[in-house]
Design a protein with these regions (language model features):
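Amphipathic alpha-helical substructures
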Residues: 396-476, 481
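Juxtacatalytic substrate-recognition/specificity segment
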Residues: 180, 209, 229-328, 332-341, ...
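N-terminal, polar/Ser/Thr-rich
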Residues: 26-62, 89, 142-150, 456-457
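Acidic/His/Gly-enriched intrinsically disordered linker/tail segments
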Residues: 346-405, 409, 413, 432-433
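Beta-strand-rich binding/interaction modules
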Residues: 76, 87-92, 455, 477-525
Length: 532
């Protein structure tokens, strides 16, 4: 999600939760991440098979999750997370009921004496209602203009435990993907991750079976219920693969669906140019209209931006559509295991938003965007949070705009001939994608190795501190100027515009001397974050 457009909503969310708690309404904090539970560190999730009946009239769910797992040793306890708002009716292993406890959102299961690698958990109950989706998540039950039910789920800040039992930690993704089977009353449709492999009438209900073989984060497992109009096309990727591209919108918005699909196509082409082929070619490229702003759910991006298309060069641009799509590369393909490194998801995706300006609006639009966004950086926290951070601890403004400005500055330091190949090489490297989750050090070490540049000082400064170098320009003689960067012990290349033209030179605290009949303009394009 985009922070600069949502800071006010975060404040509203806080006030809403505070007021509701004062009036006795239910409010809960379901943060996730941090140090992994020692019991869960012994276990790897291979697959989830989630089978749910969605009950709009009671705003509840009923069903089961079958979890396939592996462990290097025999486990005395299987520990999963599921919020206590749901009631567990039974747990099966090897076809037999087993003992369990369900307290404080933790589900502890005592396995039977077998070589079982599966457990099926039956549960159900009223859905937790989102206080301010997607920032304070949960289920959002609304009605469309025709008085039909319309439900969306958001859980980035809460994890999967608000809708299914799971090993709920960002380091845990099912290595063999998920099967998602939803039953809903006719004529409702349920849009979800992966490909729809079967839809079946069951009396007065519809059953939809979605499937993906890709690993997927718990918060990206998602489903949206409604009566939708669908538009689709076959998208030819730069890889040569033909991928289904699908858009689902409410019936009242069907007149806008073709343009939304065309914008999705343009955004995908733009993302592919800079970051390589769409990462989930076996599934689909898709968005579904949701009763909240949006989220990067894998292969089924949530879209609630009310079709706010703006001109950009010869095309149109929808910031929400493009941003959430960008997460398919940064967040869903390249994924962190510790929320401390969350900026890799948000900063790189935000920079991809700026590249749309570069690609379609040209340099003038790009630099204007960078200048405008740079005003939104408080420099209050380091971009990278302390190790083992929770989602709430790691989610702050710096991971968005400052993260993107770090990447922008990296481009300025390296130059386009090194920068663009390096970024694409990282996102295409199998060592850092899908199940091979990454850290900030993985990224910074790779960039230095790929480019052959020593960037340790640069990365340490901008990612791990709140300090900004002080630009100092001092007059020396009639036409001389000394230019230096105070507060750093390394040099960074600066563009310097003098009466003789533009030169590029490494500058540090010792400074360099330039000759100019007019005061020099340092870093005229604004590549670096400097105190001026």
């Amino acid at each position: 999600m985009n922070f600069t457009k949502t800071l006010a909503m975060r404040i509203i969310s806080f006030l809403a939760i505070f007021i509701s708690s004062c009036t006795g309404a239910f409010a809960q904090n379901w943060d996730w991440g941090g140090p992994i539970d020692p019991l869960q560190a012994k276990m790897k999730i291979r697959h989830y098979r989630l089978e749910l009946e969605l009950l709009p009239e009671t705003q509840s769910i009923q069903g089961s999750n079958t979890i396939t797992f592996s462990a290097e040793e025999k486990l005395d306890t299987l520990r999963f997370q599921l919020i206590n708002e749901y009631e567990i009716s039974k747990v099966l292993m090897d076809g037999k009921e087993v003992k369990f406890t369900h307290e404080k959102d933790l589900l502890d299961i005592i396995p039977v004496d077998c070589t079982c690698d599966q457990v099926q958990i039956f549960y159900g109950g009223k859905n937790p209602i989102a206080q301010n989706p997607p920032w304070t998540g949960g289920f959002t039950w609304e009605k469309d203009l025709l008085d039909n039910h319309w439900m969306g789920l958001s859980s980035q800040g809460e994890g999967g435990k608000i809708f299914m039992p799971a090993l709920d930690h960002p380091s845990s993704e099912p290595s063999e993907g998920v099967d998602l089977i939803f039953t809903a009353p006719k004529p409702y449709f349920v849009a979800s991750n992966g490909r729809l492999i079967e839809s079946q009438e069951v009396g007065q209900k519809m059953r939809y079976h979605w499937q993906t073989g890709y690993p997927i984060s718990n918060y990206n497992i998602n489903f949206t219920l409604g009566i939708f109009h669908e538009e689709k096309l076959d998208f030819t990727s730069v890889s040569g693969e033909v991928i289904p591209m699908q858009v689902w919108v409410l019936q009242e918005n069907r007149a806008k669906v073709k343009e939304l699909l065309e914008l999705l196509k343009i955004s995908t082409e733009t993302q592919e140019k800079y970051f390589g082929p769409f990462p989930f070619s076996e599934d689909k490229i898709a968005v579904v209209e949701t009763p909240y702003l949006g989220m990067e759910h894998q292969t089924i991006n949530a879209y609630g931006n009310n079709f706010q298309f703006v001109p950009m060069g010869k095309v149109k641009y929808d910031w929400l559509l493009h941003h959430e799509l960008g997460h398919e590369w940064w967040g869903n393909k390249v994924t962190v295991s510790d929320w401390a490194d969350m900026w890799i998801h948000e900063g790189l995706t935000a920079y991809g938003d700026w590249l749309f300006f570069w690609e379609h609006g040209g340099p003038e639009a790009y630099f204007a965007k960078v200048k405008a966004e740079s005003r939104n950086v408080p420099h209050a926290k380091p971009v990278v949070s302390p190790p083992n951070s929770t989602e709430e601890e790691a989610y702050h403004p710096e991971i968005y705009t400052k993260g993107a400005l770090v990447i922008h500055a990296l481009r300025g330091v390296l130059g386009d001939e090194l920068f663009f190949p390096a970024i694409k090489a990282f996102v295409m490297d199998e060592r850092f994608t899908y199940l091979n989750q990454v850290t900030t050090r993985d990224f910074t070490d790779f960039i230095q190795s790929y480019t052959g540049k020593d960037l340790k000082g640069f990365f340490d400064l901008y990612l791990y501190t709140t300090s900004i170098p002080k630009l100092k320009v001092s007059k020396k003689g009639k036409e001389g100027y000394v230019i230096s960067l105070q507060g750093i012990d390394f040099e960074m290349p600066l563009e310097i515009e003098t009466s003789e033209g533009v030169q590029r030179a490494p500058v540090g605290k010792k400074g360099i001397e330039v000759k100019s009949k007019t005061p020099p303009v340092v870093d005229p394009q604004g590549w670096l974050m400097l105190s001026r």
